[in-house]
Amino acid sequence: MEQDKYLTVAAITKYIEKKFEVDPYMKQVFVRGEISNLKQPASGHLYFTVKDEFAMLRSVMFQKAVQKIGFVPEDGMNVLITGRIGVFTKAGRYQFYAEHMEPDGVGALYIQLEQLKSQLEKEGLFAEAHKKVLPSFPSKVAVVTSKTGAAVRDILTTIHRRMPSVEVIVYPTVVQGDKAAQRIVENIGRINQRNDIDVMIIGRGGGSLEELWAFNEEPVVRAVYDSDVPVISAVGHETDFALSDFSADVRAATPTAAAELAVPDYRDLEERLAERKYRLLAVTRQLLERKERALEQLKQHLILNGPKHQLEQQMERTDYFAERLKNAFSKQVLLKQTTFNRLNDRLHYYHPKKEIALQKEQIILRKQALDKAMKQQLKDKQQAFIRQVEALEHLSPLALLKRGFGVTYKAGELVKTVQELEIGDNIQVKMQGGHIDAHITAKEEDTSGN
């Protein structure tokens, strides 16, 4: 019947769907275009159109694939998508089933960074009101960075130069790679478990965005924000920045700058102490001069305005007040002198001369140990060399000649067995002191096998 040649809509749609499924060029398709009409319902799937100036392609990305892309797609964003072409039978249209997506042009990391920054800023992790004030005179500083990089050397050198008395505790950690963020968070937690750390420096030297990425990871940014110990973030060079810089209490342009922010310079303290001493002496001198002028005025008043009895009373009162003034002044001077002596003692205690002397002693001891080790090693090498020379001399063919043996040559070639010689051959035997030429007239082989 002619009606048998008519197909149902479902049948023809299934046929077209099968064609797409068996076509190898449709199984993995790479598409570049602009996202438009983006929708994401409660299911988590993405429905959108990929278009260029000539055409558009309906597309869908299921929730499992959406969770892996690492950024938030938006209308107008240019993307690179990998997936397959298939048929949505209910709507009777072909569409693109996206399996992987990444930004086209601007790197995915930059987009991910800006989106995470916006999210954390809305949560208040960068708020100035939350930031803690750095201590003026820390005694212990913790450093979270690589133990082999230039950053840790710069920090240690700067702190030792500025305030040798400060103890620096380094928490070595990897600063890039898959495990870097976890290690940084763990070390921040360890530091906060202690109760003797005054300030913490986290950071590393310069690098690319990928190399600095650990300090942009959300767990690191939150750990810095939640830290009870004040945090100085010093990631990269002056032009670099990381999200940990925004959540930290203070951001430093470089590791060296972080060390300068963490501790004061003892030389500045000496200058401030000298300035305060000068101001104290000046104030004391002015106070004394004012009191002396007041006393002189009082004496003149008594002389000009009172009889003898009144004068005596006034003189007694004057003596009384003069004594009180003297005592008060003495107490003030004693108090200021005590404060000055205490500050002066602290300055001498923290002076780097002691540390320098100790380091010189350590250098001398290490040099002596090194000299001793080098001499012993040289002696051992000489003895080993002598033993090797003796062994070589023992194995030398010349040593065999000295013991009475001879070496036989035939036509310049060394003869090792009697089987190599025939009657009538001419041979040369080398012995101690010379050689002899010989002619083979007979030979006898050893049949014992020795």
UniProtKB/Swiss-Prot annotation:
Q: Pfam families, per this entry? A: Exonuc_VII_L, tRNA_anti_2
Q: Name one GO biological process term.
A: DNA catabolic process
EC no. given is 3.1.11.6
**Coiled coil: which residue ranges?**
none
Q: Which domain of life is it from?
A: Bacteria
An annotated GO cellular component of this protein is: exodeoxyribonuclease VII complex
Keyword terms: Cytoplasm, Exonuclease, Hydrolase, Nuclease
What chemistry does it catalyse, as a reaction equation? Answer: Exonucleolytic cleavage in either 5'- to 3'- or 3'- to 5'-direction to yield nucleoside 5'-phosphates
Q: Where in the cell is it found?
A: Cytoplasm
Alphabetical list of PANTHER family matching this protein: EXODEOXYRIBONUCLEASE 7 LARGE SUBUNIT
> What name does the UniProt record give this protein?
Exodeoxyribonuclease 7 large subunit
